[in-house]
Amino acid sequence: MKADIHPDYRQVVFVDSTTGAKFLSGSTAKAQGEVEYEGQTYPMVRVEVTSDSHPFYTGKQKINQADGAVDKFNKKYGLN
């Protein structure tokens, strides 16, 4: 392997911008600062959506079921 071509892999804390939740994980993402997590200082990366704020994981998901072509035809011509 060539030397000095691989990104620096390290422990990073991802911070959810919406909820403020913190997740420690390994990453090569560029840090946007530092944050203290469980008594240690780690590089920090802010993210907009995590499992703590995504509607699928929080149970606040809205399901929009689109009508198919047959349903639209039946509604248009009153064939229900």
From Swiss-Prot:
Molecular function terms, GO-annotated: structural constituent of ribosome
Q: Which NCBIfam families match?
A: L31, PRK01678.1
Q: Which UniProt keywords apply?
A: Ribonucleoprotein, Ribosomal protein
The Swiss-Prot or TrEMBL record describes its family as follows: Belongs to the bacterial ribosomal protein bL31 family. Type B subfamily.
List the HAMAP family hit by this protein, alphabetically.
Answer: Ribosomal_bL31_2 (MF_00502)
One Pfam annotation reads Ribosomal_L31
Highest taxon of the lineage:
Bacteria
Secretion signal, residue range per the UniProt entry = none
Question: Can you list the GO cellular component terms from the UniProt entry?
Answer: ribonucleoprotein complex; ribosome
**Gene3D superfamilies, per the entry:** Ribosomal protein L31
Q: Does the keyword Ribonucleoprotein apply?
A: yes
Q: What is the official name of this protein in its record?
A: Large ribosomal subunit protein bL31B
Please tell me whether the keyword Ribosomal protein is annotated for this protein: yes
Q: Which GO terms describe its biological process?
A: translation
